[in-house]
Structure formats: C-alpha cells, structure tokens
C-alpha cells in the first residue's frame, strides 16, 4: 500500500511488508529541486522511524530516467545564496539517505546523471539496467558535484576513473560501471526494480539490529584507522546483547525455526 509519508508528489512511497519502494517522479527527467530534496529527507526519516521497514529500494518513474540530476533552471541567475540553499538541501537529503539504518538499493532504470548518480552513490547497493548511462557532467555546465560525487565516486572507483568522469566528462555504460565497481549488478532493461526488490527481500533474513550495526561499522571504516574499527566492532557485538533480536536469532537457530525479528 502507499503511505502518505511523503510531503511531495515528486517522491512517491509504497511499503510492502518490510520493503519501502521510493520513486523519484518529477517529469520529464526526475530532476531534483527544492521540493523533492526535502521530501526525500522526510521520507527516509519516516522510514527510519518505522521499525517494520528493513530495506529501501530507490528508482525513477518512467523508462528513460533514473534521475538527470539538479534542475538547472534554479542556477541560471547565478545567485550564490540559491546555490547555498540548494547545496545544503542536496547534502541533507543524500546524507540522510546514506545513514538510513536499513539497506538501501538503487534500481537504476535509465540515465543517472549528476545528482541522479549522486543519490545512487548514497545507497548501499546499485543495480543498473543494461541501457543505463552514468555520468557526473556538472563541470560541463560550470558547476561541480556537490552532493557527494567527488567523495563517494572516488571511494568506489578510485581517483583515476573519478577524474575521467568528473574532469573529462566521460559518460559510462552499465557494463563498464560494473567492471569499475560502481554498480554491483547489471540486468536487462525493465528488470532493475524487480531484481532490487528480490535482493531487498533477502535483507529480512538477517536481524535488522545486526544490519544497522554492521552498516555503521562498514561506513566508519572510511574515516577511522582499522585499529579503532576493530575495537568498535567488538563494542557493537556486545551492544547487540541488549537487543531482543540477538536472543531471538540465536535461539531460533538452536531451536531449528525461523526467527521473528522485532528490530529492537
């Protein structure tokens, strides 16, 4: 069923079981603006608060675009104050998505350009259809990727290919994106959403309390020394023993039954 947790028609949400499907629906190219960005942030915050939601699948409406990035009309005036407001809206939306406690999967059903690729970079896993094209073409229009592009793309593919895409404006196809480690899977046209949803369903086999802790640890590895990460890992392990899910998971296995998670 659809939930009215989105404050904007440009971001649509449907929840089925433990999976939320979030659709960028801003014709014609699913661009980002000052309405859709705060809406995405609000949606992720609402999903974070819903303990029955374990996974989020993000896709674009229609068959051509996942998202073509920022609506450039808002930058035509050259107003730095507008740039600051929009930049902060991008940052808040995509960082909230990156920190979603469950698993986020981008179902890239078409062009993912600029902020459209950056929102996919903020997800945990990316599945692209074979016809999808990915690019960060901001410099071509006198701008730069300010919603994580220079940071997250570099972490995923290394400096060389980040520079080819950002500084040389190279657009890459889905197969090459998989070779580079930018997407985890390539599927036939029209199948990204179904494939992402099937993967999201697998998330529910794991304890949602474990998943949230593991995601925090994996993300923290980007910023801290491994010696600190190894300590944090043990601390998070012990912290799980204050959750109902730890008791349920361990005992369900020993009793040879399926666990019933509580997400607490």
Protein language model regions, located:
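Terminal low-complexity tails and localization/encapsulation signals of metabolic enzymes
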Residues: 1-8, 251-264
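Conserved CoA-thioester-binding segment of acyl-CoA-metabolizing enzymes
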Residues: 1-59, 95
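Hydrophobic alpha-helical membrane-association signature
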Residues: 36-40, 86-89, 192, 233
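Glycine- (often His-adjacent) and acidic-residue-rich active-site loop
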Residues: 52, 60-96, 112, 142, ...
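Crotonase-fold acyl-CoA enzyme core
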Residues: 98-211, 239-243, 248-251, 257
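Short, charged, surface-exposed hinge/linker loops at domain edges
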Residues: 215-224
């Amino acid at each position: 069923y659809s939930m009215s947790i989105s404050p904007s028609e440009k971001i649509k949400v449907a929840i089925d079981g433990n999976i939320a499907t979030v659709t960028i629906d801003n014709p014609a190219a699913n661009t980002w603006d000052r309405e859709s960005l705060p809406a995405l942030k609000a949606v992720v915050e609402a999903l974070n608060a819903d303990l029955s939601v374990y996974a989020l699948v993000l896709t674009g409406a229609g068959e051509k675009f996942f998202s073509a990035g920022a609506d450039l009309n808002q930058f035509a005036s050259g107003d730095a104050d507008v740039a600051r407001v929009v930049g902060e809206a991008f940052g808040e939306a995509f960082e909230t998505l990156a920190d979603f406690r469950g698993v986020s999967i981008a179902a890239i059903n078409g062009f993912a350009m600029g902020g459209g690729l950056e929102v996919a970079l903020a997800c945990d896993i990316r599945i692209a259809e074979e016809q999808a094209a990915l690019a960060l073409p901001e410099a071509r229009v006198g701008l730069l990727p300010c919603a994580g592009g220079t940071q997250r793309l570099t972490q995923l593919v290394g400096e060389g290919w980040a520079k080819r895409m950002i500084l040389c404006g190279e657009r890459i196809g889905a197969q090459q994106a998989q070779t580079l480690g930018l997407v985890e899977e390539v599927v036939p046209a029209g199948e990204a959403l179904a494939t992402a949803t099937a993967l999201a369903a697998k998330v529910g086999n794991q304890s949602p309390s474990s998943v949230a802790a593991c995601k925090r640890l994996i993300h923290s590895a980007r910023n801290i020394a491994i010696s600190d990460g190894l300590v944090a890992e043990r601390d998070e392990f012990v912290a799980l023993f204050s959750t109902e899910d730890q008791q349920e998971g361990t005992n369900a296995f020993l009793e040879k039954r399926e666990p019933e998670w509580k997400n607490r």
